[in-house]
């Protein structure tokens, strides 16, 4: 279903993101008492009165200042209005009409998009009507008093909004694969998003921390619909101050946790840092599918063997993700960027894959024939009876043995390696659960025909 879009527009610090959270009944938009917190355009779904729609939050719009990120923010607002079915101009009732409001109103009057004025910070219902009346002079119709913090007036505002929206274009809902672009600040995540999407979807700058929130972008490649999230750069905790970066990093970690696949971006010049290793550990810990993208490869002086030497060095430091595909790209030139989708889709498919118990046990049987389970000094030897896949996302196998303590880390790694060699699973972590089981209980299952033992006592 293609949803109509509402663009939230206004000066910096008038409460746009707070209003977005109120209308969407969420706290996904970062709210902080400082101008310029929102820079890129961010999307959230909402519903009211049985009608679904999409709200796009935009950065504070300023026409008479070109400092820092303001021109880029302006470009993002212009793009948001182009795709919107309705514009919601948010103004500050306590400040009254400002020159900035007048400039934005003039621009909106020249656009073809229907506009509704939401006069925010009207906590008093009675006083709010008086405060809102001043905004008639913007020439965009009746202003509506609301309080984004307390919620007063927002229900009436939503009633008005859904009355102005076109009917939803109902199509068969396509499954979306969620891909999160993860990495330290300034490794080229936003440049990669722009290269992937073919538009300037995110603001790019040499200044670390340009992206302060997680940005969602929908892209269709072949028959696959992707939801791509560019996340805020993640730094060491001691370097992160409470504020926009703190909230953005929390969003980034949440993006990892709910992703189908993570794209871990590494700077080819800097190599793998301690923070990159921690991010790799987080991805593995959460059981996410992953591919590793080495960006800025165009800046590396190389010969025919460089790529092999560099990959070996990088993998030695990213041992958490030994199962991940590694791709060397340039987000700036577009070199090998399209390969990301191919390998990400393979990783997702492996992450969701299920294998029949009979196939698992064939692999285990062969593995044991090549290398028997270890024997302790006491003379007691490990017995691997059988295994079965109990879940996917990530693929999880339970291996039933006589005593899990008899199987050390070396043999456990050997079994995982054999499963990967025989069954694949590139791009996804595997979880092997070693469970002790009594021979008597096993015999009953064998008698019922439920299982066939790989190894007997």
From Swiss-Prot:
Residues 353-438 form the KH-like domain. GTP 2 binds at residues 183-190, 230-234, 295-298. CDD domains: EngA1 (cd01894), EngA2 (cd01895). InterPro entries: G_ENGA (IPR031166), GTP-bd (IPR006073), GTPase_Der (IPR016484), KH_dom-like (IPR032859), KH_dom-like_a/b (IPR015946), P-loop_NTPase (IPR027417), Small_GTP-bd (IPR005225). PROSITE patterns: G_ENGA. It holds the Pfam family KH_dom-like. Transmembrane segments: none annotated. Keywords: GTP-binding, Nucleotide-binding, Repeat, Ribosome biogenesis. GTP 1 binds at residues 10-17, 57-61, 120-123. GO terms for molecular function: GTP binding; ribosome binding. It comes from the Bacteria. GO terms for biological process: ribosome biogenesis. Residues 4-169, 177-352 form the EngA-type G domain. Belongs to the TRAFAC class TrmE-Era-EngA-EngB-Septin-like GTPase superfamily. EngA (Der) GTPase family. Associates with the 50S ribosomal subunit. GTPase that plays an essential role in the late steps of ribosome biogenesis. HAMAP family: GTPase_Der. PANTHER family: GTPASE DER. This is GTPase Der. It comes from Prochlorococcus marinus (strain MIT 9312). The gene is der.
């Amino acid at each position: 279903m293609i949803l109509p879009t509402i663009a939230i527009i206004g000066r910096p610090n008038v409460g746009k993101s707070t209003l977005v959270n109120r209308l969407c009944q969420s706290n996904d938009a970062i709210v902080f008492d400082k101008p310029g917190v929102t820079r890129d355009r961010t999307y959230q779904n909402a519903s009211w009165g049985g009608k679904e729609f999409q709200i796009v939050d935009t950065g504070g719009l300023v026409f008479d200042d070109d400092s820092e990120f303001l021109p880029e923010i302006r470009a993002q607002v212009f793009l948001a209005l182009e795709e919107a079915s309705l514009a919601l101009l948010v103004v500050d009732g306590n400040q009254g009409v400002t020159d900035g409001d007048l400039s934005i109103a003039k621009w909106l009057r020249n656009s073809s998009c229907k506009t509704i004025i939401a006069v925010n910070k009207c906590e008093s219902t009675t006083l709010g009507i008086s405060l809102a009346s001043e905004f008639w002079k913007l020439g965009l119709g009746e202003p509506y008093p609301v309080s984004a913090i307390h919620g007063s007036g927002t229900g009436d505002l939503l009633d008005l909004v859904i009355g102005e929206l076109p009917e939803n274009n109902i199509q068969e809902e396509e499954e979306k694969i969620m891909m999160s672009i993860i990495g330290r600040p300034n490794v080229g995540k936003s440049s990669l998003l722009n290269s992937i999407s073919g538009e300037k979807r995110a603001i790019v700058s040499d200044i670390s921390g340009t992206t302060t929130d997680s940005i969602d972008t929908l892209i269709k490649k072949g028959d696959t619909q992707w939801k791509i999230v560019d996340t805020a750069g993640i730094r060491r905790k001691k370097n992160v101050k409470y504020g926009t970066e703190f909230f953005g990093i929390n969003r980034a970690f949440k993006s990892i946790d709910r992703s189908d696949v993570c794209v871990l971006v590494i700077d080819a010049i800097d190599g793998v840092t301690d923070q990159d290793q921690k991010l790799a550990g987080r991805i593995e810990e959460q059981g996410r599918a992953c591919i590793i993208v080495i960006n800025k490869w165009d800046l590396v002086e190389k010969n025919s063997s460089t790529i092999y030497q560099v990959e070996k060095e990088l993998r030695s430091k990213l041992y958490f993700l030994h199962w991940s595909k590694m791709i060397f790209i340039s987000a700036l030139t577009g070199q090998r960027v399209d390969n990301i989708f191919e390998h990400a889709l393979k990783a997702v498919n492996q992450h969701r894959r299920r294998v029949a118990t009979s196939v698992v046990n064939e692999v285990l049987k062969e593995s044991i024939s090549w290398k028997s389970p270890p024997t302790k000094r006491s003379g007691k030897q490990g017995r691997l009876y059988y295994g079965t896949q109990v879940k996917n996302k990530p693929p999880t196998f339970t291996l039933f043995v006589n005593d899990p303590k008899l199987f050390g880390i070396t043999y456990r790694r050997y079994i995982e390696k054999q499963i990967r060699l025989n069954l694949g699973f590139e791009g996804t972590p595997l979880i092997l659960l070693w469970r002790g089981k009594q021979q008597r209980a096993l015999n009953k299952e064998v008698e019922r025909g439920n299982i066939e033992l790989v190894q007997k006592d």
